[in-house]
């Protein structure tokens, strides 16, 4: 509970003793909302209360709503492989080489435009409050419109571009407000929210595959548009700020000087490299499984195992960032994903071994982004240390996550065409051991190398570069 008075102008923004800089630190230390909007004048003093940080029903309802918005918004583009398989084999889209562009636009644009959308929402708080509903409506309209498509180009615009823009508008308030609701448990909170994608990645492809097989893509898209509206609209009520607008008006979201600090640039390099390799197993694991004798259902199980393991891994990694230095967390992710790729996928010629790899990869590679809260803390600390508290007070740490998303988006977009180069002509086939000799050897090796390199910040931190 927080109380503010006109004499002390104090707002409790985080638990006492929490040294993590947040975007909620106000100029002149704190801000007092106008009496007519947030306070009650009693004996010449203005008092108002705020919900508690790191707990209480409001915080947990907010986190639960964010979990499901994350799952429903990101789960659909992460399940695009089901649509890609359907579009490739059914008219009027069969045989088109542009079908993968739909999924690339849906996911890539959502990653790339997050800092822009977050910045606009920070500048216009009233727009931010209504954004979950506005974005949801745009997503549903885009899905409904895509059900009338007669060519791939129309699908790219509707199911790809418009859906991505709507998804970003709906999702970004979750990132902006999370910093207000959680302080000591911030890493855990982000980890729980981001684990929603893994859960959706497990269940949604199964549901969509059944609907596509029974009803076709037009009816499936309309059903999902209605389901998305019904499931998500009630959640929008709980996605709300903890603080009054007056407490955050000083923040300058497009003050991006942090992106030029050495700490952030080194983290961004490792983050982008990880993004280059991270998405490749999601594209090729089912195909690889079929190449070693798996059935179509067993092949689909590979992605389901990765997503289920990622759900657990995100929550665990988020909690670890609250207790360990971020570079240690990133090294744990890199070591597990790299060794799993080289030793398990690299020598997997049987389905059980491949399943073990899927679980290991999901546990370690999937939660890499859950460590972003630690990067945010690292960068915010450097901004305060080297530029002074007053100089960095209007800096918005949540934009660190936004710019990191851009780096991951670049990796996502580049990984598509890059993967085609890596498997073209089935290199190393019959010339190497295990999985390396199946024609997917360069792809496996590249995935492993990028996974290991994503932990380079652990070394850079130890040698004093950051």
Which role fits each region the language model picked out?
Residues 1-56, 384-388, 465-466:
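Intrinsically disordered, low-complexity terminal tails of fungal membrane proteins
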Residues 65-67, 71, 139-143, 152-169, ...:
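Hydrophobic core of transmembrane alpha-helices in multi-pass small-molecule transporters
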Residues 72-87, 261-328, 369, 373, ...:
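Extracytoplasmic gate region of multi-pass secondary transporters
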Residues 87, 160, 167-182, 189-190, ...:
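Intracellular juxtamembrane helix-capping segments at the cytosolic ends
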Residues 112-154, 321:
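Conserved MFS/SLC helix-loop-helix module at the cytosolic interface between two early adjacent transmembrane helices
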Residues 137-150, 236, 335-349:
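C-terminal ends and interior cores of transmembrane alpha-helices
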Residues 184-188, 192-243:
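Helix-loop-helix hairpin linking two adjacent transmembrane segments in secondary transporters
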Residues 307-310, 321-378, 387, 391:
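C-terminal transmembrane helical hairpin of 12-TM major facilitator-type secondary transporters
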């Amino acid at each position: 509970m927080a109380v503010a008075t006109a004499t002390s102008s104090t707002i409790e923004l985080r638990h006492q003793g929490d040294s993590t800089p947040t975007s909620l630190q106000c100029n002149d230390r704190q801000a007092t909302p106008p009496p007519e909007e947030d306070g009650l004048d009693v004996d010449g003093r203005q008092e108002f209360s705020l919900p508690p940080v790191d707990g209480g029903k409001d915080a947990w309802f907010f986190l639960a709503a964010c979990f499901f918005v994350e799952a429903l918004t990101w789960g659909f583009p992460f399940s695009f492989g089901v649509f890609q398989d359907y579009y490739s084999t059914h008219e009027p889209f069969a045989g088109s080489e542009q079908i993968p562009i739909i999924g690339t636009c849906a996911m890539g644009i959502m990653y790339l435009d997050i800092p822009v959308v977050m910045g606009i929402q920070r500048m216009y708080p009233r727009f931010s409050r209504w954004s979950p509903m506005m974005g949801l409506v745009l997503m549903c309209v885009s899905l409904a419109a895509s059900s009338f498509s007669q060519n791939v180009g129309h699908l790219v615009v509707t199911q790809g571009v418009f859906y991505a823009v709507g998804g970003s508008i709906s999702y970004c308030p979750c990132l902006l407000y999370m910093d207000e609701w959680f302080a000591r448990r911030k890493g855990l909170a982000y980890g729980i929210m981001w684990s929603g994608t893994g859960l959706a990645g497990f269940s949604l492809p199964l549901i969509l595959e059944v609907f596509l097989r029974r009803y076709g893509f037009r009816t499936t898209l309309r059903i999902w548009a209605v389901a998305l509206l019904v499931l998500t609209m009630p959640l929008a009520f709980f996605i709300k700020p903890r603080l009054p607008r007056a407490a955050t008006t000083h923040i300058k979201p497009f003050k991006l000087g942090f992106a030029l600090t050495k700490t952030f640039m080194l983290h961004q390099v490792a983050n982008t490299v990880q993004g280059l390799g991270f998405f490749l197993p999601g594209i090729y694991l089912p195909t690889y499984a079929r190449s070693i004798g798996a059935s179509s259902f067993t092949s689909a199980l590979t992605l389901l195992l990765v997503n289920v393991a990622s759900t657990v891994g995100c929550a665990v990694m988020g909690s670890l960032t609250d207790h360990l230095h971020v570079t240690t967390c990133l090294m744990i992710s890199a070591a597990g994903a790299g060794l799993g790729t080289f030793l398990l996928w690299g020598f997997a010629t049987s389905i059980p071994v491949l399943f073990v790899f899927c679980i290991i990869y999901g546990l370690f590679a999937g939660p890499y982004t859950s460590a972003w809260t630690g990067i945010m803390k690292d960068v915010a600390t450097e901004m305060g240390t080297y530029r002074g508290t007053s100089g960095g007070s209007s800096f918005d740490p949540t934009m660190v996550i936004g710019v990191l998303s851009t780096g991951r988006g670049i990796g996502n977009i580049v990984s598509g065409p890059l993967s085609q180069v890596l498997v073209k002509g089935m290199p190393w086939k019959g010339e190497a051991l295990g999985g390396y000799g199946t024609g997917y050897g360069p792809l496996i090796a590249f995935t492993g190398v990028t996974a290991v390199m994503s932990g380079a910040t652990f070394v850079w931190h130890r040698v004093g570069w950051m």
